Amino acid sequence: MKVGDRVVVRYRLPTGQATDALGMLVSADATTLTVDGKRGREHISVSDVIAAKVVPPAPAPR
């Protein structure tokens, strides 16, 4: 994954449940991933990440 890729990141919430962030990876460093998606910018601690991968571009609107 690199900045500018469309990604999905599954991460653990403080409650222990998991959730996904889907959108453009706008920054990544040793401690934090920042994903810009429909819910706005999500700052995700790398230690909370369960899985992450690059996904294809969103389909065109109909």
Over which residues does each language-model region extend?
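Conserved RNA-binding domains used in RNP assembly and mRNA/RNA metabolism
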Residues: 1-62
